[in-house]
């Protein structure tokens, strides 16, 4: 059921990179066969209504991809142009968390307010960053970048769940990081959840076998349940790194196949 005074959003998942790996890298309890190929994709997302354009996460740079051994297919910021979005004009960017693959390129959004959870800023600049295992997925330049934007009065903090705009809500879960959040949007097919890293892969959720980069395992598993509860059905859940998103959902046009998916539309074959 649509909320009162809701806006209806088109939702775009834009793939900008991949990483070839085995199943053992993607699950806390490696499934059999644990050495089978199990790549992940890297995405940014865009939520577009008649009145608002909101970018969700900002991806990583080519330099970051090279340092970390990731396949960088295209610039995530430039790729927004594929769906008619000029990053220089975007006024609202949701940072679901500040890991390197979600919080880079902030300087490419000169007019944006960056939305982040209180707990994420505290986590990535606090005592837990003394430990390499917890800071490994953060890029110090990105962390300095969001602090710089704070001093430029361009960061909006959120403490838990909130409505950003009519029909677009933010939900804190923690787990993967202390300040991990996801986005829920009202679409023509109902409530769709852009889970980001609250749920990396469909199988992490369905098999109750979470992704192994985690601050609190229990919070991550509870986060899977919250994602599922706030989506209208399992087909309304969009994981943060699953290659099947490109296979399941239609592209806006044939030339954007395997680059952009319209996740506000029903999966193919339904």
Enumerate the language-model features and the residues they cover.
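Divalent metal-coordination and catalytic microenvironments
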Residues: 11, 47, 57, 90, ...
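Metallo-beta-lactamase
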Residues: 2-4, 74-85, 89, 119-172, ...
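Cap/insert and terminal regions of metallo-dependent hydrolase folds
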Residues: 70, 74-78, 182, 186-270
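Basic, amphipathic N-terminal segments that precede the first structured/catalytic domain
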Residues: 2-37, 260-270
